[in-house]
Amino acid sequence: MQESAQLGITLSDSQLEQFYSYYEMLVEKNKVMNLTAITEECEVVTKHFSDSLSLFGLLREMQAGGDAWYKTCNVIDVGTGAGFPGIPLKIVFPELRVTLLDSLNKRVIWLKEVCTDLGLEGVCFVHGRAEDIGRQAEHREMYDLCVSRAVANLSSLSEYCMPFVKVGGYFIPYKSGEIDEELNQAKKAIGILGGKLKSVEKFVLPGTDAARSLVMIEKVKPVSKKYPRKAGLPTKEPLK
């Protein structure tokens, strides 16, 4: 994975083996389950693995307390799908406590199998809709970091994800293409949901001409109990 070096990441032989095994399990399961439209090895490495790991630099910047920070950071990946970005981040940062949330139970079952086969410990698996899980006491405002590569409008995605983040924590969505207008439209929703835009890191995915952005949103106050709204509403009627 030459792309990892471009991101400033040095992978051990065992980590490289984990990524290769993950790739093999992904393409094999994809034959019977719709996990990804991308199956060529080089494309999976670039568009899934490297894209997931583009957060590496921001995690380094957020690391305030030395290596111990990783041992206490509780991360949730909302709408994880085939495990991106949660599993790649867990491989590179094995100390992270990672929760993978997805609405499709058969995907969650497969993710458990993947993490077991890869020897990844400290991973939790949750089946359900973000609108419902985000209201449960064991998940609401319990995470230091929420990440998501889910394809959704930033206003809607913020309503799905911000309820999981504790005050002082961060929500970092992965976005593709031009996002300035979308970000401008989402600023009010972000504020309503207790967030404050801290930074936007724009970059080109290594080995491609694909524009990417990491939007860093800090949780500065608790979310009102009225959010998230009932299932479907955040998408049908985004906060404005």
Predicted regions and their residues:
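Helix-to-beta-strand junctions that scaffold the AdoMet/dcAdoMet cofactor pocket
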Residues: 93, 165-167
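Short alpha-helix immediately C-terminal to the canonical SAM-binding loop
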Residues: 107-109, 179, 183
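SAM/dcSAM-binding transferase cores
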Residues: 184-240
